[in-house]
Each structure stands twice: as structure tokens, then as C-alpha cells.
């Protein structure tokens, strides 16, 4: 699971790295630098429908059709396949069939801006955290994500939220005893 990550890079550096502009909707209430982004926090993303704009969304995905708000932080690329988290798995990407994610994975993908992510061994979890940076030292980098818009029927508030797409553990995470890895992208 990639349930926590770091985002402390300045807006100007993110704009340069991702070739985007933070518009008025972002700069009016930008997410603060955060060394422990977790579900419910606002964080910067770049969406496929607005690839030139830096946007702020809530970490913790809720699909548009949901009756109540969820905080799904991860979307498994394999869906229900590979239940044992076999790092050698090369089968179907079941995320395309999961009702929770199938619409967003097709039409609402995003880049999640991160400086590092935080993981722990499968047994100790975040009681023994490791901060994982990109191997080449590039900061910030992009994690693959999906997003959606959900309207709170009680308040009418529109909540734009995202989840990080995960896959089987990379060599680095296997070495610390973790079973999943966020999908890293080159922006």
C-alpha cells in the first residue's frame, strides 16, 4: 500500500518539472508542504484532461456514483488477480474490471506529484517506516493515479479526489519486506 507520501517541493519547481501552471483555483488555497500526506489531505496532481494545470485534490478516492464518501488510497493494477502479491506476476490488469475504478482508469488518470513515499515492512507497517526516493534522485516525481468528482448530497460540496495506482513490489520494497509498490511514471 502507498498510504503516505512526501510533498514539499515549491510550486515553482513543480511547475518547471511538470511543465504546468498553477492557476487561480490552485493558488487560492494551495496544499501546504507536507512530509506525511495521508488520506483526506489536499495534494497536487496533474490530470489528463488538464495536462497544463496544477490542481489540488483530496487524497482518498471516492467514485462519482458513491452514496457516501470513501477514502480509497490505492487502486491495485491487478484488481482481484494476484491475491498473493507475487512480485513475478505478469497476468491481467484487473483494475479495468473493478466497479470502483473502471470508469476512472479509462477516462480520469492523473500524475500524483511526490518527493518520496513512505512504506514499512508488511508486518511492522509504518511502525518501522522507510522513506523511499526515486533512484535517480529526481524530485519531484510522478506516481500514477486515478481521480473522480463526488458530490456530497448532504452539503452539495463537490469533492475531487484521487487514489495512487499500485503494483507488485519493486526490488527495493521487497528488500524491506513490503508487498506492494506505487507505479512511478516519468512526467
For the regions a protein language model found, what residue spans apply to each?
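Short linear sequence motif anchored by a di-proline
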Residues: 1-187
Amino acid at each position: 500500500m502507498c498510504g503516505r507520501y512526501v510533498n514539499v517541493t515549491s510550486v515553482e519547481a513543480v511547475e518547471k518539472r511538470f511543465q504546468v501552471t498553477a492557476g487561480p483555483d490552485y493558488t487560492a488555497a494551495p496544499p501546504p508542504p507536507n512530509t506525511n500526506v495521508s488520506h483526506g489531505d489536499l495534494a497536487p496532481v496533474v490530470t489528463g484532461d488538464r495536462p497544463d494545470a496544477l490542481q489540488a485534490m483530496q487524497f482518498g478516492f471516492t467514485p462519482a456514483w458513491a452514496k457516501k464518501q470513501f477514502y480509497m488510497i490505492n487502486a491495485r493494477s491487478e484488481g482481484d488477480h494476484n491475491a498473493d502479491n507475487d512480485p513475478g506476476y505478469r497476468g491481467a490488469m484487473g483494475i479495468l474490471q473493478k466497479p470502483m475504478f473502471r470508469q476512472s482508469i479509462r477516462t480520469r488518470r492523473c500524475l500524483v506529484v511526490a518527493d518520496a513515499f513512505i512504506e514499512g515492512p508488511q508486518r511492522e507497517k509504518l511502525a518501522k517506516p522507510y522513506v523511499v526516493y526515486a533512484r535517480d534522485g529526481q524530485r519531484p516525481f510522478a506516481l500514477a493515479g486515478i481521480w473522480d468528482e463526488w458530490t456530497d448530497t448532504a452539503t452539495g460540496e463537490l469533492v475531487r479526489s484521487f487514489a495512487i495506482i499500485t503494483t507488485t513490489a519493486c526490488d527495493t520494497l521487497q528488500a524491506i519486506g513490503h508487498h506492494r509498490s506505487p507505479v512511478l511514471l516519468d512526467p
